[in-house]
C-alpha cells in the first residue's frame, strides 16, 4: 500500500472560520496522516476539534495541547485510512506527539515535533529528544521512524536560507547529530540535493525549517515529496508518499552490548585505539567534531568485536 503524509505549521487554529477552512482544505487533499504544529489548542478544545475534523470529512485525530496562544501539536487521519494507528506518547509542553502505525509486521513510529524558537532552548530540546524519542517498545528489527516537524532550524545556511547566512543556525550541530545517531534522512533534501525551496517566509526572509524525516531503511520507498503553498499560514505544507510493502530490514537502532565492553579483548583493543586517537585531537579545530567522530569509531569497534 501507499501511505501519504504531510506536515504543516498552521500558525494557530483558535478562530473557528480558519479552522473550518483548514480542515476542509486538508480533507480535499486526501492525505492519510497529517501532522499539525502550533495549533494553540487547549484541553477544553479537544472533543470539539475532533468532532469538527470528522464533520469536515476526516477520520480520527490526536492532540497534545499547548496554550491558547502558543505551541500545541496534532495528528489528523484521513477518513478512508483504516490502518491501525494508535496514540503512543506525548510530552508535557505541547511540542511532541507520537503515534504508532502497524502495517503487516512493521511498526512505524510517527512523531510530530514542534521545536522551540529560542536557540538555546532548541539545543537542549534536541539533546533531550536524542536520548528519549527513539526508544521503541520492543526490539523488533522492523521498527521505523517517521518524523514530521517544524524544527525552527535550517540545516544548510546557504541552501536553506534566503538570504544565505554567514553562520550556521544555533542548534544545527545537535540537529545533525540526531539525524546521524538515529539513522534518519531528510526526505525532501535527499530527493532535491541542490534545490533552493523554502517552507517559511517572513518579510524578505525565507527558510526551510519544516521537515519530514524517515529511517534510512525506507529511503528507497519514499517518492512524490513536494512543498506546496498553504494559504492559511506563513508556512508551506510538505507532502510525501511511502510505499510500505516489501520494506527491507534496516540497520535499526544500535545498542551497546555490555558483555562486549567488559571483555578483555575489548579493553585491550580500546586502549590501543584510544591512545592513538588522542594524538589526533590536535588536528581538529573543534573538539566537539573530534569527540563526535570518536563516538562513531567506538560504536564500530564494539560492533566488530561483538561479531568475533
Language-model regions, residue ranges each:
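Active site of divalent-metal-dependent phosphoester/diester hydrolases
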Residues: 59-77, 168-214, 275-291, 295
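Short phosphate/oxyanion-binding micro-motifs
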Residues: 1-142, 166, 262
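Conserved residues at the C-terminal ends of beta-strands
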Residues: 37, 42, 190, 215, ...
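Surface polyanion/phosphate-binding segment centered on an Asp-His-Pro turn
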Residues: 100-108, 138-141, 145-146, 170, ...
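Catalytic palm subdomain of template-directed nucleic-acid polymerases
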Residues: 153-170
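Catalytic metal-binding/acid-base residues of hydrolase active sites
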Residues: 11, 39-40, 114-116, 151-154, ...
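Mobile genetic element proteins and their domesticated derivatives, centered on retroelements
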Residues: 9, 26, 31-38, 76, ...
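Acidic carboxylate-rich catalytic motifs and surrounding loops in phosphoryl-/glycosyl-chemistry enzymes
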Residues: 38, 88-91, 152, 182-204, ...
Amino acid at each position: 500500500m501507499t501511505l501519504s503524509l504531510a506536515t504543516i505549521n498552521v500558525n494557530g487554529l483558535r478562530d473557528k472560520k480558519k479552522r473550518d477552512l483548514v480542515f476542509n482544505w486538508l480533507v480535499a487533499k486526501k492525505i492519510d496522516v497529517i501532522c499539525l504544529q502550533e495549533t494553540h489548542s487547549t484541553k477544553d478544545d479537544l472533543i470539539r476539534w475532533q468532532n469538527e475534523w470528522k464533520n469536515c470529512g476526516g477520520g480520527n485525530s490526536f492532540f497534545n495541547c499547548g496554550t491558547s496562544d502558543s505551541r500545541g501539536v496534532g495528528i489528523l487521519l484521513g477518513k478512508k485510512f483504516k490502518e491501525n494507528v494508535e496514540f503512543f506518547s506525548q510530552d508535557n509542553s505541547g511540542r511532541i506527539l507520537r503515534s504508532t502505525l502497524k502495517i503487516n509486521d512493521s511498526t512505524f513510529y510517527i512523531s510530530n515535533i514542534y521545536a522551540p524558537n529560542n536557540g538555546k532552548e532548541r539545543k537542549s530540546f534536541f539533546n533531550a529528544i536524542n536520548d528519549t524519542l527513539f526508544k521503541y517498545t520492543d526490539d523488533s528489527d522492523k521498527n521505523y521512524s517517521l518524523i514530521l516537524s517544524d524544527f525552527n532550524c535550517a540545516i544548510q545556511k546557504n541552501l536553506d536560507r534566503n538570504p544565505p547566512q554567514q553562520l550556521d543556525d544555533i542548534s544545527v550541530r545537535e540537529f545533525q547529530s540526531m539525524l546521524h545517531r538515529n539513522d534518519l534522512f531528510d526526505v525532501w533534501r535527499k530527493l532535491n540535493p541542490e534545490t533552493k525551496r523554502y517552507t517559511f517566509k517572513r518579510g524578505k526572509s525565507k527558510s526551510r525549517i519544516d521537515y519530514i524525516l524517515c529511517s534510512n531503511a525506507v529511503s528507497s520507498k519514499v517518492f512524490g515529496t513536494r512543498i506546496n503553498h498553504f494559504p492559511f499560514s506563513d508556512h508551506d505544507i510538505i507532502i510525501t508518499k511511502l510505499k510500505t510493502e516489501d520494506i527491507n530490514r534496516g540497520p535499526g537502532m544500535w545498542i551497546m552490548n555490555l558483555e562486549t565492553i567488559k571483555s578483555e579483548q575489548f579493553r585491550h583493543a580500546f586502549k590501543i585505539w584510544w591512545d592513538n586517537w588522542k594524538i589526533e585531537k590536535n588536528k581538529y579545530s573543534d573538539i566537539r567534531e573530534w569527540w563526535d567522530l570518536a563516538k562513531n569509531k567506538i560504536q564500530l569497534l564494539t560492533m566488530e568485536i561483538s561479531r568475533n
